[in-house]
Amino acid sequence: MKTSNFTLLILLFFQVFRLTAQEKDILIGGEQLKYRIHLGFINAAEANIRSSSNLGSIRQIPTRKIEIEGKTLGIFNVFSPLLDVWVSHIDPSTLLPVKAEMNKREGRYRKQEVVDFYHDKGIAQISSPQNSPKDKNLAISNSMLDLISGYYFLRKKNLQDLEIGQKMSAKILVDGQVYEIWCVVKGFEKVESKFGTKNCIRTSLVLPKNNLFQDKDAIRLWISQDNYQIPFKMEVNLKIGFLSIDLEDYKIAGKTIYTALP
């Protein structure tokens, strides 16, 4: 399995924050989530997401910095090491990205990219030393998202109002390409975990046609049915095997939100 696929799955996992959420301040400062990723029975990778405690400012726009880090572990880190860092600076008032940064280290492959979003002008300025040309402008809609801001936008929706069969979508800009991702509500289930039994909403993610996943219902995702509404568990049928992503830890401002069973 290519290491870059781990990062794709990690970011898709976090996309659902944007697809399911309460009507409240969802850009929580000091939020930290840790996930463990298994390929079959192998502990393959981990992912961490962190939000800054304080607001910053870019072009005089208040922003919250969100960072996602994905890295391989164990045998995967020996033969196919990955350390990817994705950063988004999001305007809390609109939940749109102001600036996005990417730093990929996958084996010998390296790529850095910075995207500045000018939604009022309908332009994204993309800069990468690995691109040719290095700098380019891309026409975008006034509501275009990046991968991480896609993590929040529809989180404004109240999970309790969702119905089985309901569909939600988000359009995101990745590597100079625009993709549309759909989230379909499949049902409500209890999920067993290290934190005990958790009530969750089960969804499926539908992606553009690709060679990575086995079928249309290949990505199944469970979202916690509580005040936090976070991605809790994910299962993926890949063409080369079975992958699972499980919540390992969740904190806000250093305080543990979910306590593991003894």
Identify the residue ranges that each predicted region occupies:
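Bacterial Sec-dependent N-terminal signal peptides
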Residues: 1-24
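Alpha-helical structural elements
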Residues: 9-12, 30, 146-148
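Acidic, serine/threonine-rich low-complexity disordered tracts
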Residues: 22-119, 158-262
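Hydrophobic, well-structured mid-protein blocks that either form specific transmembrane helices
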Residues: 113-155
